Amino acid sequence: MTDVTVKSLAEEIQTSVDRLVQQFADAGIKKTETDFVSQKEKEALLAHLNREQGGSAGKPDKLTLQRKTRSTLNVSGTDGKSKPVAVEVRKKRTYVNRDAVEQAKAEEQAKREAEEQARREAEEKAQREAEAAAKKLVEEQAKREAEEKAKREAAEKAKRQAAESEKVTNQHTEHKQKPAQTDKTIQSEKARREAEAADLKRKAEEEMRRKVEEEAKRVAEEARRMAEENQDKWSSDSDSIDSDDYHVTTSRHARAAEDENDAKVEGDRRARGRSGKATRQKKNNKHSESKADREEARAVGRTKGKQRKTSTLQQSFNKPVAAVNRDVVIGETITVAELANKMAVKGSQVIKAMMKMGAMATINQVIDQETAQLVAEEMGHKVILRRENELEEALMSDRDTGEAVAEPRAPVVTIMGHVDHGKTSLLDYIRSTKVASGEAGGITQHIGAYHVETDSGMITFLDTPGHAAFTSMRARGAKATDIVVLVVAADDGVMPQTIEAIQHAKAASVPVVVAVNKIDKPEADPDRVKSELSQHGVQPEEWGGETQFINVSAKAGIGIDELLDAILLQAEVLELKAVRSGMASGVVIESFLDKGRGPVATVLVQEGTLNKGDIVLCGFEYGRVRAMRDELGREVFSAGPSIPVEILGLSNVPAAGDEATVVRDEKKAREVALYRQGKFREVKLARQQKSKLENMFANMEEGEVSELNIVLKSDVQGSCEAIREALEQLSTDEVKVKIIGSGVGGITETDATLAAASNAIILGFNVRADASARRVVENESLDLRYYSVIYSLIDEVKQAMSGMLAPEYKQQIMGLAEVRDVFKSPKFGAIAGCMVTEGTIKRNNPIRVLRDNVVIYEGELESLRRFKDDVNEVRNGMECGIGVKNYNDVRVGDMIEVFEIIEVKRSIA
């Protein structure tokens, strides 16, 4: 190993140079900062440091290492969105010195053996002492009895000797006479005394044996009592030994639960063991069979007396025998995987259930709430439908609506009618301005919102387009209005858009005031207008109805005051009121993207007061009102009910018809707007997927359908919606209009790139392309078209679609010839001699051979001759010879029909 300097070594081990030099000095090695350090010197320094830290005293018994690993995991939630979740994996590993552990176990074992030996010695000593005491007691008793017996025998002997001596003295003569009889008496007396002594000895031995047995019983009783008193201590020691064998977890609570489970299992085994069912139990539980045997075999060695302790480990899991019905909470949309997770079943089962119900889905497909409810109920679960707009409801409830005192407000009047019937001109005269001249083509293409002051009060007018493409804009105007003024030209009568306006007014339950315009024209016929409108449910007051009819002339100014009076009279009948104080709410009439000001929305305030600086939640968009302007472009700072204003400051262009609401918290408004965007997208995708799957067989033929891709940009949101709807209605079975992208504002480079990628044409309605977009258009040779009138746009799209239609081919009969005779030719076979009866017979045209007006062959001419000369055509009334290619069965009387196929150009109706 290469030697290193002291300085580099200090940097390597992350310590100061001075400290390292001092440690070398303490180890007996003198070093400076620039000196080299060899491997031996490093080992010497390490040994010195180990000695200082007590490393030589012995190795540590236990070493614990911890490691943390951090990562990020994307987890999908209940709303279907992926959220990054930080995951930290903590690993802990403990290394144990086996020598120390074995030594500790050996010491513990020796200690337990010593205690057991001491206990046994104590029992043996107590037993020996009891036996010695009993033996000593028996010996003393026997000694006392022997002494007493000896005294009694001595006294009796003395007494007998005295009696005998007296008897001997008195009967000396008799003894002398009978010596043989005296010897016999002495022997019998001696035998009697020996028998009495043996009997006394036997009785003493029996007494001693009885006392020894009683003492042994007493000692055994004391030993049993001692064992009962120390049983808890000894069993706890034994359990601590056994716990190392069958505890497989380190948690205290888990060990307690495991002990309870084992005790329960042991109780069941003892109850079943007597009936001989333990074997079947062991076979039924495959998980515990081998381990239970090992535990029982291990427990045999610990058996004491008649007590047995077995500890078995088995995982008691029983398969559910009945279906589990769950409460499934379903939001507005849910994926198939989430639905399966809530029902605790596999995703494949949910897909099978949906296929049985006639719906096809994939595991990650988003389905709507209704479909999910049907599937869950079909599978036997209880469904709880959840509304996921709690945040939105909380935000809407936290609004200051003031004291809720309703005050009279100005009526909102919508002017409807057929195109060119004079709606805008009538409004111009009322406002004394010239708005109609500013509209392209003289037709209204936006919703104009104006409020005018009259002598009788203020009136807010909404001018809607009359063109058929602006149906949604007229419907939107009817929803936001109080009174509809239906303008009908006296010289034109009721037209399709007039009927449509009546339907919108009836659907919105809005009263109608009919203004019969162009009354100054000579061909005007007001009675005809009344008659035609009465056929559609609009009855004039003169005929017993409820609708006011006012004859007006927008150019001459006839009947304008009467019309305003009729409007105000109708407003008085309606008793229109609104709350002026508090937070405002209204509806978006129109919206567009201004290049200098950003998103601009025309809002009609319906309740409250809209102030500059308020936070507005408008459909999918939100923002703070940075500026407000009236219809004349003047800046205003507040707007009350029935006042239309343009507001600036929204995050994007809102959709026309969205409800605009003032809220308190901008942060919550942003959350609600984002939630609405996501939910709208999910619901839209769910519906699209559902329609695609339901029309699966129809979609198989889509590859044969031509598509006209369009990128559409408009100046305002309402016009964009109207054009989009009109273009989509142009689609046919053969050519479909596909709107690749649409929006409000100028044509940008992004739009041009999108059109290039999708092979689409770019349509601009009252907008222009910027420089970068024009550059992309030139480089990619894209089709870019500008329009200012909707008629021209729709007509040109129709022409483009007509060019994409498959051509239609038509057969046109050129001539007819009758076969008069048949000749044989070695070169062409059968030659038909014919007379041309109609038209002209031309060479190389397809022909048909007819027999009895039935086509029997279709082919082409091979030879056409007149007087043995080849000719190109034969006119009517002339004879010729015709050779049919690959056909020789020509007969007299057949008709030969010559035709040609012409292409017919198709167009979109």
From Swiss-Prot:
**By its UniProt entry, which PANTHER family does this protein fall under?**
TR-TYPE G DOMAIN-CONTAINING PROTEIN, TRANSLATION INITIATION FACTOR IF-2-RELATED
G4: annotated segments: 517-520
Segment Disordered: which positions?
49-314
Superkingdom assignment: Bacteria
What stretches pass through the bilayer? none
Q: Map out region (G3) in residue numbers.
A: 463-466
Q: Where is the composition biased (Basic and acidic residues)?
A: 99-177, 186-236, 255-270, 286-299
Query: What functional role does this protein have?
Result: One of the essential components for the initiation of protein synthesis. Protects formylmethionyl-tRNA from spontaneous hydrolysis and promotes its binding to the 30S ribosomal subunits. Also involved in the hydrolysis of GTP during the formation of the 70S ribosomal complex.
Region (G2) location: 442-446
Name of the protein: Translation initiation factor IF-2
- Bias (Basic residues) occurs at 271-285
Enumerate the PROSITE patterns for this protein: G_TR_2, IF2
Q: Where in the cell is it found?
A: Cytoplasm
Query: What molecular functions are annotated in GO for this chain?
Result: GTP binding; GTPase activity; guanosine tetraphosphate binding; translation initiation factor activity
Any idea which UniProt keywords this protein has? Cytoplasm, GTP-binding, Initiation factor, Nucleotide-binding, Protein biosynthesis
CDD domains per record: IF2_eIF5B (cd01887), IF2_mtIF2_II (cd03702), mtIF2_IVc (cd03692)
Record region (G5): 553-555
Where along this sequence does the record place binding of GTP?
417-424, 463-467, 517-520
Assign the protein's first listed, main location to one coarse class: cytoplasm
Entry similarity comment: Belongs to the TRAFAC class translation factor GTPase superfamily. Classic translation factor GTPase family. IF-2 subfamily.
Tell me which species this is from: Photorhabdus laumondii subsp. laumondii (strain DSM 15139 / CIP 105565 / TT01) (Photorhabdus luminescens subsp. laumondii)
All copies of the tr-type G domain together span: 408-577
